[in-house]
A protein has these predicted regions:
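C-terminal helical subdomain
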Residues: 169, 188-223, 230-232
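Substrate-binding pocket helix/loop in short-chain dehydrogenase/reductase
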Residues: 87-88, 95-100, 190-193
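Short C-terminal tail/terminal secondary-structure segment
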Residues: 135, 224-241
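Alpha-helical segment proximal to the catalytic Tyr-Lys
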Residues: 116, 158-163, 221
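Short, flexible catalytic-loop segment of classical short-chain dehydrogenase/reductase
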Residues: 171-182
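Conserved glycine-rich cofactor-binding loop
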Residues: 12-13
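Catalytic loop of short-chain dehydrogenase/reductase
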Residues: 124-149, 154-162, 174-175
């Protein structure tokens, strides 16, 4: 059986690493890309998979990695994110530009580089958004603007690349990670956020890794252009406080 590579950009984070573990269970070969080599080594050793150090803000580094993989790319997951929460009155143009570069432009550039191989293999693309795009939260203009663009990218790409390549997006609620640790390390704040969800807890990467692995796999034959809200019900349900 031939090896089927899935590029996981942001593979050292909680979402990317959980997805990579699930892909490995399903006989796909995750190729991890991230900036933090220490974390990459740890996950790579655990999964016995390849990793490359790369920065989405330095597209040449991603270009070299993808060229190295040749035409054996069957999927691409862009698990990179950022968090910048503040009132709009305290934001600068640079906040929005940086967030767009990390969350949106980085995904666009990676997809463009991998596109020939993805087309050849009839592959799949998985992007990540946030519940804040649909729900609308205070102090979230920076991240919601960038991730809103990711959702638009998902729909446009799904239409453009059909029927050869499937493109979908997962939009979780607050998820436990190094990036969100400054929020959820505050026990009182964590509890207050948890009870806003009909299923009252903070998300974990493995709460939606199996769905991500399915979307990237050949088992997903008929799902494209979808934004999946895996958020404990926060985006759609209202419960008594």
């Amino acid at each position: 059986m031939s090896i089927k590579n899935i590029i996981v950009i942001g593979g050292s984070g909680s979402i990317g690493s959980a997805l990579s573990k699930e892909l490995k269970k399903n006989n796909y070969e995750p190729i991890l890309i991230a900036r933090n080599e220490e974390n990459l080594k740890k996950i790579s050793n655990e999964l016995n998979c390849k990793y490359f150090v790369g920065d989405v803000l330095k597209i040449d580094s991603i270009d070299k990695i993808i060229k190295n993989l040749g035409d054996n790319i069957h999927g691409l997951a862009y698990c990179v994110g950022s968090i910048n929460l503040r009132p709009i009155s305290l934001t600068k143009d640079e906040d929005y530009i940086e967030s767009f570069k990390i969350n949106t432009l980085g995904a666009i550039n990676a997809i463009k580089l991998a596109l020939p191989s993805l087309k050849k293999n009839k592959g799949s693309i998985l992007l990540y958004s946030t519940v804040a795009v649909k729900q609308g939260f205070v102090n979230h203009t920076v991240i919601s603007t960038a991730k809103g663009a990711v959702e638009g990218l998902t729909l446009s790409l799904a239409a453009e690349l059909a029927p050869t390549i499937r493109v979908n997006c997962i939009a979780p609620s607050l998820t436990n990670s190094n990036m969100t640790n400054s929020i959820i390390s505050n026990i009182n704040l964590k509890k207050a956020i948890e009870v806003m969800h009909p299923i009252p807890k903070i998300g974990e990467g493995d709460d939606f890794s199996h769905i991500g692995a399915f979307l990237l796999s050949e088992k997903n034959k008929w799902m494209t252009g979808q934004i999946l809200h895996i958020d404990g019900g926060r985006s759609t349900l209202r419960i008594k406080s």
